[in-house]
């Protein structure tokens, strides 16, 4: 079944266009295995006067609205017709956004072919499986970019990371993982396509070791991060290097975005003065007191379920 390449792929590309300076998802995107039932749409349409302020955020709100409408249109169709109906509805809703995205978010256009290849090639042969795989991939792509852009207007409240459940003392490592990831993503973006995964993993391990003062030699010393990565790309571990890197980066993107949001929410203004007064002491002893990865476990579980 043919896909209208530059219509459908545009919205998968949304999750692939931001560089490390704007988000962690440069060239990131992955295609989970087909689900037994169609995936739940990534988010609800934004209400009038939503919180989106940038062109990219506003575009994402429109994408989510069109996505939900297309899923709803296919919901009651026979399994063999679901993909065709979804594609037609989604393409129709996107017509008015193509020109807008080209003018206001020009970085999308160069990513269209890559987005199409990563998403559509993962679709199964049968129409039923193709629909599930495609919608699941699109759902995950939208959730990744929603977190990266912090478009809370298109993210249900139930999907927010609840920092109150995370012990304050265990938030210390978040900034260190975040910094290490940015260093690694920047290094990987400059590497040839087939080398991205190797460069990213090596750079991330090195940066994590340096940022934590040797407390964590590699990301594999944080079991929950390693488990999340394995879970995310288990089905595609033998895929092409560029796909493996995209999956790896997307998994860590979601985890670190969750931890960063939790960290911000866990620092009330009333405690700002106290926190500032203890920064020097904390920095001097960080390597010795880095907490166990319970924070990573909690925030990662939340994100893998809800993003």
From Swiss-Prot:
Its keywords, alphabetically, are: Allergen, Signal
Q: In which tissues is it expressed?
A: Pollen, starch granules.
Q: Does the keyword Signal apply?
A: yes
Which N-terminal stretch is annotated as signal sequence? Answer: 1-25
Origin: domain of life: Eukaryota
Q: Could you tell me which InterPro entries the record lists for this protein?
A: Poa_pIX/Phl_pVI (IPR002914), Pollen_allergen/Os (IPR035506)
Transmembrane feature ranges:
none
Q: Does the keyword Hydrolase apply?
A: no
Under Pfam families, the record lists: Pollen_allerg_2
Regarding protein family, the annotation reads: Belongs to the Poa p IX/Phl p VI allergen family.
Q: What is this protein called in UniProt?
A: Major pollen allergen Lol p 5a
Q: Which species is listed as the source?
A: Lolium perenne (Perennial ryegrass)
């Amino acid at each position: 079944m043919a896909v209208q390449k530059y219509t459908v792929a545009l919205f998968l590309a949304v999750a692939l266009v931001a560089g490390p300076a704007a988000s962690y998802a440069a060239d990131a995107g992955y295609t989970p295995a087909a689900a037994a039932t169609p995936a739940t749409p990534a988010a609800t349409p934004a209400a009038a006067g939503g919180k989106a302020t940038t062109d990219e955020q506003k575009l994402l709100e429109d994408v989510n609205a069109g996505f939900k409408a297309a899923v709803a249109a296919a919901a009651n169709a026979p399994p063999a017709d679901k993909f065709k109906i979804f594609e037609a509805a989604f393409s129709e809703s996107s017509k008015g956004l193509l020109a807008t995205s080209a003018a206001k978010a020009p970085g999308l256009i160069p990513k269209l072919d890559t987005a199409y290849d990563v998403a559509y090639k993962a679709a199964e042969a049968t129409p039923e499986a193709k629909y599930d795989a495609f919608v699941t991939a699109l759902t995950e792509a939208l959730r990744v970019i929603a977190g990266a852009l912090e478009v809370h207007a298109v993210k249900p409240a139930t999907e927010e990371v609840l920092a109150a459940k995370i012990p304050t003392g265990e938030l210390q490592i978040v900034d260190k993982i975040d910094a290490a990831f940015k260093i690694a993503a920047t290094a990987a973006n400059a590497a040839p396509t087939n080398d991205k995964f190797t460069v990213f993993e090596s750079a991330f391990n090195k940066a994590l070791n340096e940022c934590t003062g040797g407390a964590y030699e590699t990301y594999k010393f944080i079991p929950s991060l390693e488990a999340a990565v394995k879970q995310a790309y288990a089905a595609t571990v033998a895929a092409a290097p560029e796909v493996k890197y995209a999956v790896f980066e997307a998994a860590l993107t979601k985890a670190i975005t969750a931890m960063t949001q939790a960290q911000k929410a866990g620092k009330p203004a009333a405690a700002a003065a106290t926190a500032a007064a203890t920064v020097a002491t904390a920095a001097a002893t960080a390597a010795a007191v880095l907490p166990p990865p319970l924070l990573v476990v909690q925030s990662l579980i939340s994100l893998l379920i809800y993003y």
